[in-house]
A protein has these predicted regions:
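Residue-level recognition of tetratricopeptide repeat
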Residues: 31, 65, 97-99, 132, ...
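Generic helix N-cap/helix-start motif at coil->alpha-helix transitions
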Residues: 19-26, 52-61, 71, 86-96, ...
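Terminal, low-structured helical/coil segments at or just beyond the last alpha-helical repeat
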Residues: 201-216, 459, 471-512
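Amphipathic alpha-helical segments of tetratricopeptide repeats
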Residues: 17, 84-85, 151-152, 186-187, ...
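TPR-repeat structural position
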Residues: 5, 39, 73, 106-107, ...
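Structural motif corresponding to the intra-repeat A-B loop/turn of tetratricopeptide repeats
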Residues: 2, 36, 70, 103-105, ...
């Protein structure tokens, strides 16, 4: 039944019909249907057990979402306020009621929002809803500080919330504040700015009780997704989509969750449901590319990424995405060239990511392609743009160290990176390896042991530690380190480790 959620739900429903007193089985049928995105079937099942005290939280939320979506606000609110269910869902009621009341009494709506306790699971969304309700009243100056606070709390929803506020400020007749909500070089924001500057809304409004409920559920899903367990966050996101089908951010978040749950086909369907005209379509394409890469469907990923870069409005993000796909295919030279195209677009004033990040990606790809002079130039450009970025300092320093180029300067770079990011095990590993290359074995052993303790699963750290221990004459301990490295090793690295375990450290088996 794993993966076939419709079949699972139907089976549970059949079992429930055979044993109507067993509400647990019925609840599982609803849960399976929701998780699989079979919302019509889930609603049919949930409505059949709506009066049951054993109705699951996902089924209850789906019934609320359906009532709000269809404009039956009083019934949806009553379901939220109903006592007897576990867990108690009434903490969602004040926000939803505020949106319902706000149609006729804005001040009463704001009073209802003030009833949400600071420690409530939806407490972080109060500023967001207050700003949106104030904007519905045309009070844009009052809304602005709450909007900015909400953006700061939005996390992974930041761009979506910025776009919603831009829409709301424009609708309230305040174009300057609408534009202020979407400042920045991000491609999503740049695309949105072009529309707002022309006085065109973005289609990203949060403008109804159903929209607000959808966003509440999406925020809860993201919060819960940080903990172990994927089923409830996925269910909440599916319900958020049902409450507000136009909420493309919910589709993108759902795709990311499904991909992490190793359901690539469902994830791709979610990403591909986002229309190309959406301001968030770039995020959806990023998710689609990552899902295809994780599923080893690299030809599909390449076709998609190349297609997007041939359009007249292709952006630096599109070129960077192509670079990511090519890098996943080990076509590193072409990946470096794609990142180079992205850099050129940003340098010409187009929207896109930070140039230092793109230069780092380009340098890394070219270094793997054995185009070291070009790689070094890109990495040095990244360092000039971001002289205190640990990733840049470490990458350039380590690349020089591997080539025996300015070894003293390379160690200084890596030591600086380690001082800036002492908790980063990979950088600590680089520092230990630099100390080894400089002949300071006791110091290198201590540093590499610290790195291994910080990230016990990283193969490279254990291999480095084993090499240094062996060189220091501590060969028994070296074998333990190499055996630990074998756990996650693949292909050439695994073969090198096996050779070391058989014959010890030689110039041919030394880590690069």
């Amino acid at each position: 039944m794993v993966g076939d959620y419709r079949h699972s739900a139907e089976l549970y429903a059949t079992l429930s019909a055979a044993a109507p007193a067993d509400r647990i089985v019925a609840g599982r049928a609803v849960a399976q249907a929701i998780t699989g995105g079979e919302m019509a079937f889930a609603l049919q099942l949930a409505k059949g057990m709506a009066q049951s005290p054993d109705l699951g939280v996902d089924a209850r939320l789906l019934l609320v979402a359906d009532e709000l979506r269809n404009g039956r606000h009083a019934r949806g609110l009553a379901l939220l306020k109903a006592s007897g269910g576990e867990p108690d869902l009434s903490f969602l009621a004040p926000t939803v009621e505020a949106w319902i009341v706000g149609k006729r009494d804005g001040d009463a709506a704001l009073t209802l929002l003030s009833q949400v306790p600071v420690g409530s699971p939806v407490g972080p969304r109060v500023a967001e809803n207050r700003a949106l309700l104030l904007l519905k009243l045309g009070r844009s100056a009052d809304a602005e500080p709450f909007a900015r606070r909400a953006i700061g709390l939005a996390g992974g929803r930041e761009n979506r919330i910025r776009l919603a506020f831009a829409d709301a400020f424009l609708k309230a007749g305040d174009k300057p504040r609408a534009l202020a909500m979407i400042e920045g070089r991000d491609v999503v924001l740049a695309v949105a700015r072009r529309s707002i500057e022309q006085g065109k809304r973005l289609g990203m409004a949060i403008d109804s009780p159903a929209d607000a409920f959808s966003e509440l559920l999406l925020g809860l899903a993201i919060d819960l997704n940080r903990a172990n367990g994927k089923a409830l966050p996925i269910a909440l996101t599916q319900i958020a989509r049902h409450a507000a089908p136009a909420n493309v951010q919910a589709s993108i978040i759902l795709g990311l969750m499904l991909d992490a749950d190793q359901r690539p086909d469902a994830a791709l369907a979610a990403f591909r449901s986002v229309p190309p005209s959406s301001p968030l379509s770039s995020q959806a394409r990023d998710g689609e590319a990552r899902a295809l890469i994780r599923a080893k469907r690299l030809t599909e990923a390449l076709t998609m990424a190349q297609r997007v870069t041939t359009t007249p409005d292709a952006t630096a993000d599109d070129q960077s995405r192509l670079g990511d796909v090519l890098a996943a295919m080990d076509r590193d030279g072409e990946a470096g060239d794609a990142y180079g195209h992205a850099i050129a677009l940003v340098a010409a004033g187009g929207p896109g990511g930070e140039q230092w990040t793109l230069q780092l990606l380009r340098g890394g790809a070219l270094e793997r392609a054995d185009r070291w002079p070009e790689a070094k130039q890109a990495l040095e450009a990244a360092l000039a743009l971001a002289p205190t970025q640990p990733l840049v300092l470490n990458y350039l320093g380590y690349a020089k160290l591997e080539r025996g180029e300015d070894v003293g300067g390379a160690e200084v770079m890596i030591a600086r990176a380690s001082a800036l990011a002492p908790e980063d095990a990979s950088i600590t590993d680089s520092l230990g390896w630099a100390q080894y290359k400089r002949g300071r074995l006791p110091e290198a052993i201590v540093t590499l042991q610290r790195a291994a303790a910080s990230d016990p699963a990283q193969t490279e750290i254990h291999e480095h530690l084993g090499d240094v221990l062996y060189s220091a004459g501590r060969r028994f301990e070296a074998r333990f380190a190499w055996q630990a490295a074998m756990i996650g090793a693949e292909d050439e690295v695994a073969a090198r480790l096996r050779a070391k375990l058989d014959v010890g450290l030689t110039p041919a088996t030394a880590a690069p």
